[in-house]
Amino acid sequence: MATMTRKEYAAMYGPTTGDAVRLGDTSLLAEVEFDHSVPGDECLHGGGKTLRDGMGLMPGHDSVDGALDMLICNALIIDPVIGIVKGDIGIKDGKIVAIGKAGNPQIMDGVHPQLICGVATTVRDAEGLIVTPGGIDVHVHFDSAQLCDHALAAGLTTLIGGSLGPITVGIDCGGEWNVGKMLQAAEAWPINFGFLGRGNSSKPESLLGQLRGGCLGLKIHEDWGAMPAVIDTCLKVADEYDFQVQLHTDTLNESGFLEDTLAAIGDRTIHMYHTEGAGGGHAPDIISVAGKSNCIPSSTNPTNPYTVNTFDEHLDMIMVCHHLNPDVPEDVAFAESRVRPQTIAAEDILHDTGAISILGSDSQGMGRINEVICRTWQLASKMKDQRGRLPEETTALGDNERIKRYIAKYTINAARVFGIDSYIGSLEPGKLADLVLWRPAFFGIKPELVVKGGFIVHAVMGDSAASLYTCEPLVMRPQWGAFGEAKQALSVNFVNRLAVEADTATRLGLKKQLLPAFGTRTLRKSDMLHNDACPDIRVDPQTFDVYADGERLHCEPVSEVPLAQRYMLR
């Protein structure tokens, strides 16, 4: 019997069970937990390979018979729900049908009945590549239309947030007419969008038009007034119409302190933006909401991970972001009250212990949209370096539990908080085929390929006038799925059910499908996969030190991070 060494097998078919792969230049190792492949019957495409008629392709098995539209074979899958496994990914009608062993069951062993390949099946070999779900940014300020291009190039396939462009402070898509224009503009990109309206009203009637107009949820922001009456009203409407409320609390504590806000919330579910506080929120103790079972906490990437530059860059960013005047002492005090090294350091640890469940960008509202994914992995690597391997790890040398915890922050948990996890957030069967392929050396920073709705929309591409598409310069460029009517067919907009019932898509002439969110009002912190910790968090009002279950949370800022200047020129 012919044999291969592990090294030879990995070079031809990708790593198998027990092998480990380093993620970029981080300290993280992903160890293969299970391999769906059947040795000797692996799928490979190309000259002299197995995916030929009568071999890996089943003769006469066409689309109507269930043949896959697209096969991604021999992929190392990193998924918060499925785990870290090796297998073939089957795509049909823009959705994932199964993960397992693909091919021709007439001559191959172990072929999954839904992963049969035929003449209609296009193939992307993924041996040596990592596949993840498309990223979800839960905290976007749409101040610039061009951020969509940066998002796709970074591996984000769903953007949720507000703003209408370069207005004074871009917070939300308030107003039925305004959100309609954003939905019409969203037709231009192969990206899923969810637009947030303005929840700052103590009168419930004024909120419903935004939901009928196409908003996914509502956002309460301190710049419009985050008073207890506003919070209570918005949550009452949310409970009736099933949408998520995002809360950016009152930094100045003018309308009440944290205790007053929590009293207004009661035991109702709410999505807490800026859990750490540098981006906004009750100073200095907003971070304690990460220990509440009904508060779903997220934070944003400017403070993650904590570095020697974090404190200095935030003061200027806050002044610009919130339309503050550096010549007005009260405005300067507002900015300075937000930036606390103690809570920023604690934020890193609360992410690592799973107490903060989600990480978004706060794009152009102090964050950077192209750094959602890379900063998540920078933080995970920093925490491994400073805190060691997690005690709950079960593999021989991998960091799988930590990896699953961190990828969940911008995939499945980001989807669950908005009630859209039945559509996106993982590579589970039945979900939209939104996925990203990475070369391990570039994992988390530069994707190799972005697949949206089962079709390639962005990819590393060489000179198009050259003889091969691998000829330099290699640049991330839009591909066929990003043009014509394909971009609308491959993506969706997430809305409240009122917009679907009002047939808003027809009224606005939209080609993108509108999909309703549901199940947001029964969520608890326990629904946040790998990130459901609820420690008792206390902030010392004098020193700003943060304590979780009585233990002081502290970590040092770092002067170097992975996935940085080794890859980028800035």
Swiss-Prot record:
Alphabetically ordered keywords of this record: Cytoplasm, Hydrolase, Metal-binding, Nickel
Positions with a binding annotation for substrate: H221
Active site positions: H322 (proton donor)
Cofactors (names): Ni cation
Domain Urease: 134-570
Any GO MF annotation of the entry: nickel cation binding
Pathway: Nitrogen metabolism; urea degradation; CO(2) and NH(3) from urea (urease route): step 1/1
Modified residues (N6-carboxylysine): K219
Annotated EC: 3.5.1.5
UniProt-annotated binding residues for Ni(2+) 1: H139, H141, K219, D362
GO BP, one annotated term: urea catabolic process
Reactions listed under catalytic activity: urea + 2 H2O + H(+) = hydrogencarbonate + 2 NH4(+)
UniProt cofactor note: Binds 2 nickel ions per subunit.
Subunit structure: May form a heterohexamer of 3 UreC (alpha) and 3 UreAB (gamma/beta) subunits. May also form a heterotrimer of UreA (gamma), UreB (beta) and UreC (alpha) subunits. Three heterotrimers associate to form the active enzyme.
Protein known as: Urease subunit alpha 1
Organism annotation: Pseudomonas syringae pv. syringae (strain B728a)
Gene expressing this chain: ureC1
